C-alpha cells in the first residue's frame, strides 16, 4: 500500500468498525481490541521488549519483492515473540505476500489462519496463495472475516 493511503484507510475503517482502528506508528504498544494498519512505504515488525510488551517497529528496512510494507516480514517478526495467541487474516490482494511468513509462523505456533473467499475478492492472489499452500483453517466471505477472526481471538 502506498504512503499516504494507509492513514485514510485506517480512519475510514475506524468509522465503520466496532474495534479501534489506527495507522501503526513506530513505538506503538499493541493493545487488545485495536487494529493496526501498517504504514504505506514502511516495513512493520513486532518486537517484544524485556517486560513482554509487544511493540510495533515502523521502519525503513528495504522492500522485499518490491513490497513495503511486506506481510511476510511482519508475520516472520511474530515467530520470535512469546505470545502464542495469534490469528492471521488474509484478504484480497495481488501476489503471494504473507504466505511465506504465515507458513513460518504456523511452524512455530499453533495459529488459526482465516482467508477471504474467491467470490468476494477483487484480486484473489494473496488468499489463493495461502489456500493452495494448505495453511488456512477457514475460508469465508469478506463479510464474515471479522466475526471469524473475533471468534478465534475471543474479543
Language model regions located:
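Conserved acid/base catalytic micro-environments in cytosolic active-site loops
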Residues: 1-155
Amino acid at each position: 500500500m502506498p504512503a499516504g493511503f494507509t492513514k485514510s484507510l485506517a480512519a475510514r475503517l475506524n468509522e465503520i468498525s466496532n474495534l479501534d482502528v489506527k495507522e501503526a506508528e513506530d513505538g506503538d504498544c499493541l493493545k487488545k481490541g485495536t487494529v493496526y494498519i501498517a504504514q504505506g512505504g514502511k516495513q512493520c515488525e513486532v518486537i517484544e521488549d524485556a517486560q513482554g510488551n509487544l511493540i510495533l517497529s515502523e521502519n525503513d528496512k528495504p522492500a522485499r519483492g518490491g513490497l513495503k510494507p511486506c506481510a511476510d516480514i511482519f508475520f516472520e517478526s511474530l515467530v520470535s515473540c512469546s505470545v502464542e495467541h495469534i490469528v492471521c487474516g488474509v484478504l484480497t490482494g495481488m501476489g503471494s505476500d504473507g504466505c511465506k511468513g504465515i507458513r513460518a509462523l504456523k511452524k512455530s505456533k499453533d495459529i488459526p489462519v482465516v482467508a477471504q473467499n474467491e467470490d468476494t475478492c477483487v484480486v484473489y492472489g494473496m488468499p489463493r496463495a495461502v489456500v493452495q499452500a494448505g495453511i488456512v483453517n477457514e475460508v469465508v466471505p469478506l463479510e464474515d472475516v471479522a466475526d471469524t477472526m473475533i471468534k478465534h481471538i475471543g474479543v
